[in-house]
């Protein structure tokens, strides 16, 4: 069994970067999608439904869009700047998703709704890139 495990590990090492890259692309595309749906600015839905100031609602939309773009582009920047951009985008995603869970979904805390929703996966994926950066 140990030998079989080593063979699988040796084979899959060739694809290790693909695991992080695929998670990064899905996360980035999701945030680009969610952010772009809030245009034109200010997003009237956020302003009216959550009673947000237009500047704050616009900041949310731009933060989502830019986080998605940056998390993808930073994968191809192979120097400390790429690592910093990845961590900043990850941190921004964590802050956005934490705020969204508190403001928009406060009834979800520690229920099946939370753990069966995309929001928790976006939050944890952002946390992954905040901690990991561009490091292997």
Sequence positions of predicted segments:
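Extended, low-polarity transmembrane helix blocks
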Residues: 1-37, 58-66, 70-136
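Membrane-interface interhelical connector segments
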Residues: 2-3, 40-54
């Amino acid at each position: 069994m140990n030998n079989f495990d080593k063979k699988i590990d040796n084979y899959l090492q060739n694809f290790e970067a693909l695991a992080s890259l695929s998670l990064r692309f899905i996360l980035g595309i999701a945030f680009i999608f969610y952010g772009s749906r809030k245009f034109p600015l200010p997003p009237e839905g956020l302003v009216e439904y959550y009673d947000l100031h237009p500047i704050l609602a616009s900041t949310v939309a731009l933060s989502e869009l830019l986080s998605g773009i940056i998390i993808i582009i930073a994968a191809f920047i192979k120097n400390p700047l790429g690592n910093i951009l990845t961590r900043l985008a990850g941190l921004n995603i964590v802050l956005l998703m934490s705020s969204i869970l508190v403001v928009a979904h406060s009834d979800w805390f520690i229920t099946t709704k939370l753990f069966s929703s995309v929001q928790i996966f976006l939050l944890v994926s952002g946390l992954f890139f905040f901690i990991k950066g561009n490091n292997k």
